[in-house]
From Swiss-Prot:
It comes from the Archaea. The keyword DNA-binding applies. Keywords: Chromosome, Cytoplasm, DNA-binding. Belongs to the archaeal histone HMF family. It is found in: Cytoplasm; Chromosome. It comes from Archaeoglobus fulgidus (strain ATCC 49558 / DSM 4304 / JCM 9628 / NBRC 100126 / VC-16). This is Probable archaeal histone A1-2. The keyword Cytoplasm applies. PANTHER family: ARCHAEAL HISTONE A. Coiled coil: none annotated. GO terms for cellular component: chromosome; cytoplasm. Binds and compact DNA (95 to 150 base pairs) to form nucleosome-like structures that contain positive DNA supercoils. Increases the resistance of DNA to thermal denaturation (in vitro). Homodimer or heterodimer with another histone. Dimers then assemble into higher oligomers, with the DNA wrapped around the protein core.
Amino acid sequence: MAELPMAPVDRLIRKAGAERVSADAVEKMVEVLEDYAITVAKKAVEIAKHSGRKTVTADDIKLALSM
């Protein structure tokens, strides 16, 4: 079950220039975004742990994105 709501993802695709978006396209984009977010979050958690913290910060996310 998807964690991200479909409507905002549909709006993002339309904001990128699409006039029409199929439900399958939105579902696939949600899947891709969730997979990417989980990957980044896991890296950020490891960075926080390595720094001796339990709290993930915005800097951890930025660093995870640059890896």
